[in-house]
């Protein structure tokens, strides 16, 4: 899980204010840290199928949000993927 301080920092960085938590860029930016922690978990626990389901759900959610952002606001999409170092 993300700490409250880290979460607040991500929200202000991508949402432009503390209260803008529903912005697509903010929602996308909050997912990579959880995904990375789960990757490390699966290196140690290869047979944990229940957590794998949650991991796949998070990856798919990020994928759907990125596709939505790409269709609606391509400039914001480019900024987000460059800031998070995801995709090409």
UniProtKB/Swiss-Prot annotation:
For this UniProt entry, the molecular function terms from Gene Ontology, in alphabetical order, are:
rRNA binding; structural constituent of ribosome
Identify the species of origin: Mesomycoplasma flocculare (Mycoplasma flocculare)
Q: Which family does it belong to?
A: Belongs to the universal ribosomal protein uS15 family.
InterPro entries attached to this UniProt entry: Ribosomal_uS15, Ribosomal_uS15_bac-type, uS15_NS1_RNA-bd_sf
Taxonomic classification: Bacteria, Bacillati, Mycoplasmatota, Mycoplasmoidales, Metamycoplasmataceae
The UniProt entry's GO CC annotations, sorted and at most eight, read: cytosolic small ribosomal subunit
**Keywords carried by this UniProt record:** Ribonucleoprotein, Ribosomal protein, RNA-binding, rRNA-binding
State whether it acts alone or in a complex, and with which partners, per the record. Part of the 30S ribosomal subunit. Forms a bridge to the 50S subunit in the 70S ribosome, contacting the 23S rRNA.
Q: Which CDD domains match?
A: Ribosomal_S15p_S13e (cd00353)
Question: What function does this protein fulfil?
Answer: One of the primary rRNA binding proteins, it binds directly to 16S rRNA where it helps nucleate assembly of the platform of the 30S subunit by binding and bridging several RNA helices of the 16S rRNA. Forms an intersubunit bridge (bridge B4) with the 23S rRNA of the 50S subunit in the ribosome.
Protein name per Swiss-Prot or TrEMBL: Small ribosomal subunit protein uS15
Under Pfam families, the record lists: Ribosomal_S15
Give me any GO biological process, just one: translation
């Amino acid at each position: 899980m993300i700490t409250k301080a880290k979460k607040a920092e991500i929200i202000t960085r991508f949402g432009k204010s503390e209260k803008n938590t529903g912005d697509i860029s903010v929602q996308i930016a909050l997912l990579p840290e959880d995904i990375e922690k789960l990757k490390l978990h699966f290196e140690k626990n290869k047979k944990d199928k229940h957590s794998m389901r949650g991991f796949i759900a998070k990856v798919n959610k990020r994928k759907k949000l990125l596709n939505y952002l790409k269709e609606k606001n391509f400039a914001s999409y480019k900024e987000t993927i460059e800031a998070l170092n995801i995709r090409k």
